[in-house]
Swiss-Prot record:
Subunit structure: Component of the PAN1 actin cytoskeleton-regulatory complex.
Gene that encodes the chain: pan1
Cellular component terms (Gene Ontology): actin cortical patch; endosome membrane; plasma membrane
Family from the record: Belongs to the PAN1 family.
Name of the molecule in the record: Actin cytoskeleton-regulatory complex protein pan1
Region Disordered, residue ranges: 1-161, 268-309, 323-342, 620-649, 799-871, 895-1485
Membrane topology of this protein: Peripheral membrane protein
Compositional bias ranges of the Polar residues kind: 59-78, 111-127, 134-144, 323-338, 1177-1188, 1238-1248, 1255-1270, 1353-1363, 1472-1485
Amino acid sequence: MYSSSNSFMGGANSARPGQPPFMQQPSYSQYPPGQPQSQQQTGFPSQPTGYGLQPPQLVGSQLQPQQTGFPGQLQPQFTGFPGAAPQQQQQQQQLGGFQQSVQQPQFTGYPPQNQLLSLQAPSTTGLPTRPAPRTSSEVASSFNDGAGVAPPPPPKSAGSKIPSIRLSFITAQDQAKFEQLFKSAVGDSQTIDGGKAKELLLRSRLPGSELSKIWILSDTTKSGQLFFPEFALAMYLCNLRITGRELPPSLPEKIKNEVSSMVDIISFGVPDTQPEPSRSNVPSFDAPLLENKSAPPAPQQPQPQQPTNAHLLSQLAAQPTGFLPQQTGFQPNQSSFLGPSAGLAPQATGFPGQSQQQYLQTQPTGLMTNPQATGYSGPRPPLPPMPTGFGSNLSPAQTGGASALVAQPTGIPGQWGFVNAPSSGLPNIEALKQQLMPQPGREGGFTTAGLSGNASIPWAITKEEKKIYDDLFRAWDGFHKGFIGGDTAIEIMGQSGLNRQDLERIWTLADPHNRGRLNMDEFAVAMHLIYRKLNGYPVPSRLPPELIPPSTRNLNDSIGTVKSLLSQDAESRKASGAFLQPQKTGVSYLKEHSFRGGARSPGVGRKDATLFKNNDEAAAGYRSSARRRVGNNARAASPATSHTSEEELSVEQLKKKIRETQIMLDAVDFQDENRAEEDEALDRRDRREAESLMDRVRRIQDDIDTHPNATFRNLDNGAEKRSLRRQLQAYEDQVPQVASEVRRIERELAEAKLELFRLKDAKAHPNSASNIVGTGPGGAVTEADRIKARARARMQARAAELAGRPVPASADDDGAAARRLESESTVIRADRERNEAMTRDVEESVREFTRSLEDSFKEGGETSTREHERRRWEDALGVEDVIRDFIYDLKRGSRTAHVRKEEETRTLPTHDHRVRHEDPSIASRPSPAPSAGSVGSAPGATHEDRVAAARERAQRRIAERMAAAGLKPHTDSTETLVQRQEREKREREERLRRAEEEDAKREQERQRRLAEEQRGPAKPAATKPVGKKPPPAPPSRRGRTDSAGQADARPAVEETAATEQAAREQAIREEQQAQEEETKRLEMEAQQREQELLKEKEAQEARLRALEEQVRQGKVRKQEEKRRKEEAERSAKEQEAKLAAQRAELEMARERERQLQLELEGLEDESSSDEEGPVNITPQDSTPTQSQVLPAPSPAAAAPEPELEPPVSPEITSSASSHAAPSSFSPETESKNPYFRITSQAAENQVSSPPPVPQTTITSPKTDVQSTNPFHRLAQQEAAKPAFTAPGPLERKSRVRPEADDDWSAAGSDFDSSDDEDDERPGGGSAKQLASILFGTMAPPRPLSAMDDKSPSKSSTPVQDNTVASPVVPEASASLSAPAAPPPPPPPPPPPASAPMVVPSYDPSTAPPPPPPAPPIAPPAPPPGPPPPPGPPPPPAPPGAAAPAAPAGAADRSALLASIQMGKGLRKVQTNDRSSSSSAGRVLG
């Protein structure tokens, strides 16, 4: 294809080294030329014919077998070679019909002969029924005379070989099972037929319709047989249907590609089943091929040693027969022997599996007298006549019905199939095309194993190959660029499966110019080299001439020609000295070597490129006469187109020329005028359009300015966006801190809940093993803790025995407490995880919201283009002056309209303004006086003003509350630009509004006066009977009397004067009435203003009084707190002294305890101890614990004093509540509330030296858990600071058993209340317990008046530190304690020393629980009076608490006496005197 001759298409006349030229082929004989050839007894050796053992499957369109050669007999014939003996030609009748197997190349022609051959039987040219075919082994055996050795048996097949390729749609185990089942069913075959497949598929018990669909989908080759991948696909589809899934209407692309690829691999990999040819003396017809082994390897055609199916397919190329060993695909047949008078005619040979347009071309076989165009119909050298012994009566004829040849699949059915088999003589070329075509799914599952082979492929690219490669190129060159880039080429060539080194070498050969891309011809070269490599040929080191593309070869030839011409020209000019002469125009050194083939070329009429010279004369126009003269040429004429000089023109001609020129100039002027008029008209039209557009823009701008929402246009400015972005960033930075704080609080809550459960569990199960308090690292229970717990348990049991109580049963095993703790821990952990998930969700939502806000900021941001447009059309930058003036005019109009609109919206009637000030709800607002912010929030104000006013009110409210609390409001020292602009804008608007209100008032007054003056003449008749008529003026009365007396003299003058006087009087009266009305109106307005100011002043005074009252109360509270602190410090010192004394006593008692313990352990008879136990052991009376002495809720503390004040205004109420909040917060919220500490500091700064207040404190009610759980205090005792809270003076001890009070064991209570000093030691608790048990009743019962000297462990109110968060009092207890007594009045500023001040308990370290809501009817603050009467008995305590104690009263004896004098009743107390037996324990033994 690429060669200019006919030797590059695989023809027979390939002019290659090592081969003789045409008509000079060597003789094809067993003997060399010149030697006699003896008669041979054997025929041709057995030739491989493909699948000779397969049954014939011929249809009517195939060639029927015909008898060729010498039928019926074997007679010696002489071939007529000069100088050689006659050669015995033995041709046995062969059945040359086409089988479905690839035929071995046979030699059907003979060289020229000079002796006639006798033909005894003509060959049948019809299409008779074909007899049974014979295999190649039978053909080989027919040449033996019977004396030879029998052919060896065919080799045993190795069985069906399934490629080790993994199918992706089934598992590896299923594939192994299917392979085993397939091999057991097919044996040595490669396919399973329909019957066996049906038997296997029917085992699935699927309906026939489903199996039919499965067969249709599985039989991809449509051959009625299944390869293994098809069988595996069928089993896979059966499995799909069995599991209930529907069958797909068509196979997915990936599965189809995998199955088809594996079928191709199996099809191309089927080995030959024929045996090796038998060793005999049959001449070797491959000898001529072996003679060219010494030839250069580049153009020679390598021959495979063991021909296979792939080789045979690649060898089926049309060849001229009779010269070199040709490959025709037929058995050795001598066709066209039609009789003695008929010579050998050309017959159609080749391969039946190809179409007639490709390879089915006439071939000269045998003798011919004229050259016959066979095999290749292209131009070729003429062939000389070949005498063959026959006459010239040979005529071409086709035998065997060549017209009925159609493409048929070769091989046995199902081996390649009707789909996967290639349709050309080159094997695997179609598979390679399908592999390399761009198609979906090519990335997955394609294998390249089926593309390799060992076929015989020529160097030259055939037409069919070129067509396939061109189709591939066009398919990949989707944009029709004419080339394929390196990336695409890598993708295409990488699908071939070759290694990278081979592909690099192929690319280097295909891209000789190193352009990095391949055109169509270079791509074909690369594909051909890949195809050769896949078939076992090495990649050449340099590109052979047959593979050089025509475009490259022609271009290289052209470049070489030009280079040679240039070099020859340079040499000739150098030799002749022409390069020293000036260049002469029109001289070409390439006249005989033109690119167009010389002067005789068809394009001789056109000037060649080598002869081109610009013709300056052809250019019309003026040329100066002073132009440079070239050489010796004469001076050219001045006008280039003028052939006559100007002197030769006559005057008339010159005048005519002038007139013509004038006419032309006039015409040009006329055209210019017309063009100017047109331009002017266009300019006028453009101006009109521009003016109309400007008017339209103005109207639209006016509409925008007058729109109600026009105010919101200026809100979205850059400064506000930046401010909002900074705020957003600040909030976003606070999110992690808040989240970590939330997690910390959750962790603390979980730990607190777990600790609370431990305490409750210890209370519910006193004898449980969980009572062991670990003193090891991290709270771990050590062995010393267990020893101490066991000793404590023994002491409790012994104490119970001594007291006569039953021994506490330890029914709770060691694992129950752990299980309960674990279950509670699980619940707490689940709650914590749930809260953690909620926290994460909140964080994620906050992040998403932040991102959305940031995106909105970014979307609203200006890009460079938008900013440029805005600066151009809004700031008038880079535009013309007219447009700039227009833009400035629009901006001025917009500002004016904006100000006018704001003025209109802010103009409010004065009456509405006054009503707004008279509104009591407005007067009770938190703001001290109506300011600009409250006015700006009118309904007519803009959204921006309303937002600013609301923000101002909120800030002012917060500032007032903080000022009332004694705090300095936190204000940002640096005022932002937006805030400053808003403030200035509000001030300006307020000034404008006030000025407009005054103008409106004056205008209304002026209009009213004008209206009254206009109604003047008609008004007297209506106003005389109604209004208060002033007395008539004296001149009028005198005038009347005079006129009556002188009526006759001057009637007309008097009448005229009277009329004028009456008119003047009427005008004066009306003016006086108007003045009176104006005066009254002004007075009313002045009174209204005075009233408004008075109301504002009263409201201000009320607020000031409330604030002063709050400050005074704060001072009182501060004094009380200071007094309580001092008292607590004093009591703490006393307690320390008492504790020191008790420790000394305990030290003295430890020795006694040790002795008694030894005695108790040594006793054998314990009955005596039981007799004395109830009398001697009284631990409950001697050591009252926290569970026995409980605080009682104080009736006076039910309502705190800030809520007793009358609600002056919502602001006062809110302020009071804000000040009362610190005193009503629970201890849990005390650490979180900054106002409490700051309020205390501010009140402390404001307090002067207050008058003394009675030292009376009333304990605040505590919850049952706080007051009755000793374990809580036990766990927190080390961190608690000693504080003092005076117990109630009327508190009584209970003399009953502790089981009747709160079900707490005496030993447990004693242990828990007295184990906080020396519980660090393992045995310390035991000594203390024993001492408290044995010596608790030595001293006589203490009087009630000395109850205030108890230690903190025996006080009615447990001492708590701010680190211990006490729960808030429930609403039920609050509601029970609230109505206990009428709320006491607030203390007066100078409280008397005699009156006991009743204030709620206020611990500086812990805040009390929040107070209940204020009663609905609270009396106003009266002057100081007598002390409040005692309240009723306290309400019952909440469930789970101990018996309530008596209400707390005064802290000393005088307070107790005062309470008794007021009628306080005391409960009768029975004293159980055990002094006789409490002095010492008995020593037994």
